[in-house]
Amino acid sequence: MLITFSERFALPVEEVFSYFATPADWVRLYGSVGVRDLGSGWYAVGIKGFPFPLVAKSTLVEPGRLVRWTFRGFWRGEGEIRFTPSPGSVLLEGYERGAVRWLFFLSPIAERLLLESRFRKMWELGWRRLHKRELSRGPETSGDATSENPAA
């Protein structure tokens, strides 16, 4: 299973990056049912609708630029998100590749029929939550002399 994406958000790169820095941060986006620290950077992330947690570890973190991770346990695979800031927004591009361990040649069939749409929906949920965050921020004020100051 391979999921690729390219999404733009009118949010600061630091804010968006904070949702992806470690697997423990993913619960803020994906409606996970909890996260457990397994030590050495590994986390078991419970996912709604899945019988087994996603056991993941960030393998490369460049703050504000890149996050790469790997899976182990029931799932095997990896993923990556690249962050490209521009004035007023950030572009996220990347992929997640995963498979069910122990199904061998049946894994692609099971992934296509049972898992891929669920994983896509999970990513879409995260994107919706970030877009909702954009809307909740509203217009920013700089605090300069043109701003109204009722205390003055």
Language model segments and positions:
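Glycine-rich portal/gate segments that line the openings of hydrophobic small-molecule binding cavities
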Residues: 24-78, 87, 125-138, 149-150
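Intrinsically disordered, low-complexity regions enriched in Ser/Pro/Gly/Gln/His and often acidic
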Residues: 17-19, 34-36, 62, 68, ...
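A short, structured loop/turn motif at beta-sheet edges
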Residues: 10-14, 59-64, 82-91
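Hydrophobic-ligand-binding modules of eukaryotic lipid transfer/binding families
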Residues: 1-8, 86, 95, 132, ...
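Beta-strand/loop substructures that line and gate deep hydrophobic ligand-binding cavities in soluble
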Residues: 71-125, 138-139, 143-144
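Polar/charged side chains located within well-ordered beta-strands of beta-rich proteins
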Residues: 7, 26, 58, 69, ...
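Hydrophobic ligand-binding cavity/cleft-lining segments
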Residues: 1-39, 151-152
